[in-house]
């Protein structure tokens, strides 16, 4: 393999994919590759893909067509498609897209240098085997900036929700050693990072391979290892979130008071068909426990409109749930069949597309009203905001987030991204709060 070949990664999808791209970059750098700033400067272009939502292949199809043209001009250019899409739709990759030289699933990144080497010999190659032990222990991600960092604490999912493709693209659950996670958190704190997010398809299922320690124990250990760093986590499953975890959040001041708890539907019958393993009464009890233990906590969720067999009364139950819980934010989608899932194999996709879209819009409209009202209640208060970046829409202002994950835009003054700032909130929309600086709590040491 020629020394110093340049690679460029384009990442699609979730936070886990962002973390995986950092792992991919580290593997290639350690093998002697160099990073390219743009696709045009690269010898190897890697697309790290997500298969969770509808039309995952179509999202990369246009880019692959562009790369097909680029390969005619640059004969040695190699293109690899990585992540969940090739793991889920392997047959389609090579047959439909001649630009692709190699594909690799989420458990194969350690072997990318040899895969690229094979593809350089004009052999289209694939590495898609699941590795039930692979958690990329010992590989430190390449990270952009020094404000926020992701640490994947576990990979895969055992829940087998009927609509979800994750168990088929990322395999069964396996966890990072607790000592490795806390050690990485400590390193990030010493390097000056302000925020760490612990990632997993279902973090509540975390189990230390050596001791069996739970996620609440891991979260507590990370909070102690990085006491001056904000600690977040995602994603939780309602049936698995524990009182012990909630108590840990309440006990440690640097664990953010924000819980993302996907409910998917407000109907018990739909939840049963989804194979979620809980009902609405159990979900509402978890919400009550969270709010009792964490005054002022912000809550977000996921909603799917138009799942198989959903009736109008099921849809109304979802709207009622939104009114009851009054989430601060929600990720909302209409159902689309994902090949290979339990729903695709056993349930008819029998809700009309027009009904799916109408129901989704009604959910969005209601949630925007609720989010707007929740944000209005924050106006007049003072919040601690971690400045993250320049505001794209408001020159001279910074965008940051509160402990509760509310987005805040405020006048920059002498502040910079990474500063922790006290901001008086003066106005709001359904998505964003605006305010004026009242003081600097802690400056970012660049």
Swiss-Prot record:
Family classification: Belongs to the methylthiotransferase family. MiaB subfamily.
Name the record gives this protein: tRNA-2-methylthio-N(6)-dimethylallyladenosine synthase
Organism lineage: Bacteria, Pseudomonadati, Chlorobiota, Chlorobiia, Chlorobiales
Protein's cellular compartments: Cytoplasm
Gene name of the record: miaB
Function comment: Catalyzes the methylthiolation of N6-(dimethylallyl)adenosine (i(6)A), leading to the formation of 2-methylthio-N6-(dimethylallyl)adenosine (ms(2)i(6)A) at position 37 in tRNAs that read codons beginning with uridine.
Subunit structure: Monomer.
Record-annotated membrane-spanning stretches: none
Positions that bind [4Fe-4S] cluster 2: 157, 161, 164
């Amino acid at each position: 393999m020629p020394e110093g070949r340049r690679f460029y990664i384009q990442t699609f999808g979730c936070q886990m994919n962002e973390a995986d791209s950092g792992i991919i970059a580290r593997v290639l750098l350690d093998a002697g590759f160099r990073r390219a700033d743009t696709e045009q400067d690269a010898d190897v272009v890697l697309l790290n893909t997500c298969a969770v939502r509808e039309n995952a292949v179509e999202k990369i199809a246009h880019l692959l067509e562009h790369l097909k043209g680029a390969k005619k001009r640059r004969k040695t250019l190699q293109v690899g498609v990585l992540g969940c899409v090739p793991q889920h739709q392997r047959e389609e990759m090579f047959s439909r897209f001649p630009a692709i030289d190699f594909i690799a699933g989420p458990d194969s990144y350690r072997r990318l240098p040899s895969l690229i080497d094979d593809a350089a010999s004009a052999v289209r190659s694939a590495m898609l085997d699941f590795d039930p032990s692979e958690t990329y222990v010992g590989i430190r991600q390449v990270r952009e900036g020094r404000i926020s960092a992701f640490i994947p604490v576990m990979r895969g999912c055992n829940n087998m929700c009927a609509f979800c493709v994750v168990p088929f693209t990322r395999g069964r659950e396996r966890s990072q050693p607790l000592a490795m996670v806390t050690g990485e958190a400590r390193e990030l704190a010493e390097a000056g990072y302000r925020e760490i997010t612990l990632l997993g398809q279902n973090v509540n299922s975390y189990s230390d391979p050596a001791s069996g320690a739970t996620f609440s124990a891991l979260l507590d250990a990370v909070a102690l290892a990085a006491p001056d760093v904000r600690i977040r986590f995602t994603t939780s499953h309602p049936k698995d979130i524990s009182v012990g975890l909630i108590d840990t959040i309440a006990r440690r001041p640097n664990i953010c008071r924000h819980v993302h708890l996907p409910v998917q539907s407000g109907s018990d019958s739909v939840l049963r068909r989804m194979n979620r393993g809980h009902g609405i009464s159990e979900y509402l009890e978890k919400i009550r426990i969270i709010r009792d233990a964490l005054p002022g906590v912000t809550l977000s969720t996921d909603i799917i409109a138009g799942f198989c067999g959903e009736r109008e009364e099921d849809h109304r139950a979802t709207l009622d749930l939104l009114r009851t819980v009054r989430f601060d934010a929600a990720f909302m989608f209409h159902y689309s069949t994902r090949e290979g899932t339990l729903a695709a194999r056993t349930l008819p996709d029998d809700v009309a597309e027009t009904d799916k879209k109408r129901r989704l819009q009604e959910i969005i409209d209601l949630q925007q009203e609720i989010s707007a009202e929740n944000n209005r209640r924050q106006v007049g208060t003072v919040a601690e905001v971690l400045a993250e970046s320049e505001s794209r829409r408001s020159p001279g202002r910074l965008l940051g987030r509160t402990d509760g994950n509310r987005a805040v835009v405020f006048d920059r003054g002498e502040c910079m991204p990474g500063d922790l700032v006290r901001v008086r909130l003066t106005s709001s929309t359904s998505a964003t709060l605006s305010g004026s600086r009242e003081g600097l709590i802690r400056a970012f040491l660049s």
